[in-house]
């Protein structure tokens, strides 16, 4: 079967068979860097802590189109649950490319490389520049990957006008959805302090569960904002709630609650924090808050990049795309802080992070063509 593979699928095979479980890269970036260097890119390795990253650029003055992505994949889960071994990549009898990373996001990486190789061959003197920002730390803590590389680029005033992130944005058919923004993510660990005691003598103790419950209920019922044309209303979710010693006759001394905001551009970090504090204070709690901001919301309005991507999808697939800001966070949140227009465009996401991850193999060739046509519209 290998002899009949398209160039995009050949590269996808080579990437997927490498077990690059986050933050390990397993030579994926070395393969990509060799291909890019061969078509005139200046390649810069950026190993930060245990994370492999690289920045590559080709071209001169003018607008810069960046392709961004990650070579790391999530853990496989139980191997005996897979129809085929997760790194024993193949195209099955239904034409599906099977393997961990097929959708998220080694298929996109292969499409990017092959599209750029073709574009550079067809337009060796293209205007502006093409760049790549690739990391092995997207599926993990995401502290020493794109986030850290972006800070280095910022320090040296590197220009990034447009960025295509290869995250699997499509829902049912290739290109039916692109992400033109993402909600912000603000997490918090709340500790409510009480006083431990015997359940038979509640007047000698302070039960933090009883004390915290009304406040948590009010937080859960609060309407934080109404959203806008691009974002749904901000959501509040408690993800962990822990208290107690394990004994049935002991009132616990403290309660810990972990919660998360996915917030729109209608809310700010400071505003959400102030409102949480006001509600907790209203209930007279003795508490401590530890906040963790994962990323601010960002939005790419209709313009050069979104228009070029949408037109290319229409030309290649015949369908109109729908811009969306739904879903979780991505590395686009870091790149957007440079003032860059960011669009996420990749294959169907129906099986990402699942057992038996797969995508339609032919979709990767279509994706290659979409990336190619987008470059033609922006840089030819």
Curated annotation (Swiss-Prot):
Zn(2+) 1 binds at residues 70, 104, 167. The active site is at residues 72, 138. One of its GO terms (biological process) is L-arginine biosynthetic process. This is Succinyl-diaminopimelate desuccinylase. Its EC number is 3.5.1.18. Pathway: Amino-acid biosynthesis; L-lysine biosynthesis via DAP pathway; LL-2,6-diaminopimelate from (S)-tetrahydrodipicolinate (succinylase route): step 3/3. It is an enzyme of class 3 (hydrolase). InterPro entries: ArgE/DapE_CS (IPR001261), Bact_exopeptidase_dim_dom (IPR036264), DapE_proteobac (IPR005941), Peptidase_M20 (IPR002933), Peptidase_M20_dimer (IPR011650), Peptidase_M20A (IPR050072). Signal peptide: none annotated. Zn(2+) 2 binds at residues 104, 139, 353. It catalyses: N-succinyl-(2S,6S)-2,6-diaminopimelate + H2O = (2S,6S)-2,6-diaminopimelate + succinate. It comes from Ectopseudomonas mendocina (strain ymp). Keywords: Amino-acid biosynthesis, Cobalt, Diaminopimelate biosynthesis, Hydrolase, Lysine biosynthesis, Metal-binding, Zinc. Homodimer. Catalyzes the hydrolysis of N-succinyl-L,L-diaminopimelic acid (SDAP), forming succinate and LL-2,6-diaminopimelate (DAP), an intermediate involved in the bacterial biosynthesis of lysine and meso-diaminopimelic acid, an essential component of bacterial cell walls.
